[in-house]
């Protein structure tokens, strides 16, 4: 009598579990609430110069891919270093950054940039998480301020300009 009871128990368990394991809705969408796209125009030149080279994030072989003058180009035949970064490339880099960790990005933006270290982008740039390029910013330096002020919705244009020439 134990066997039929066990079969009934397993069948009931599976019947309850199967709906929970249903495939995701293919029509579902996620709204990305990234930092202001227009102000990214001030941040992008620093990221392109420091992070977007072919040996770093300017390649298709990285999870975070950046497009622009120093690395990957969107237009066929446009080679690195040959022409300025296009607006389409800035858009693609913005989308790549915002979509890397969409839920965390949404939370950081909703919190007006509080605790930006929740983002892998910030942790790796600061060197608090393993990064092949090492630490590229120090907390509070102009490079860090450029990124974190953008995440907070108050892009520090002066810091972003200084980040381009910061040693």
In which residue ranges do the predicted regions lie?
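Sec-dependent bacterial lipoprotein signal peptides
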Residues: 1-21
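Aromatic- and Gly/Pro-enriched helix-to-coil junctions and flexible linker segments
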Residues: 21-167
């Amino acid at each position: 009598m134990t066997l039929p009871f066990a079969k009934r128990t397993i069948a009931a368990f599976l019947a309850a579990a199967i709906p929970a394991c249903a495939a995701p809705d293919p029509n579902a969408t996620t709204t990305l609430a990234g930092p202001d796209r227009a102000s990214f125009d001030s941040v992008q030149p620093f990221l392109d110069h420091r992070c977007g080279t072919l040996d770093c994030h300017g390649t298709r072989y990285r999870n975070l891919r950046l497009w622009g003058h120093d690395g990957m180009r969107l237009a066929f035949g446009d080679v690195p270093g040959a022409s300025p970064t296009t607006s389409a490339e800035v858009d693609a880099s913005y989308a790549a950054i915002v979509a890397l960790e969409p839920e965390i990005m949404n939370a950081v933006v909703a919190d007006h940039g509080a605790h930006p270290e929740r983002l892998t982008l910030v942790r790796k740039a600061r060197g608090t998480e393993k990064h092949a390029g090492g630490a590229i910013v120090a907390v509070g330096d102009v490079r860090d301020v450029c990124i974190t002020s953008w995440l907070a919705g108050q892009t520090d244009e002066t810091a972003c300009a200084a980040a381009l020439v910061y040693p």
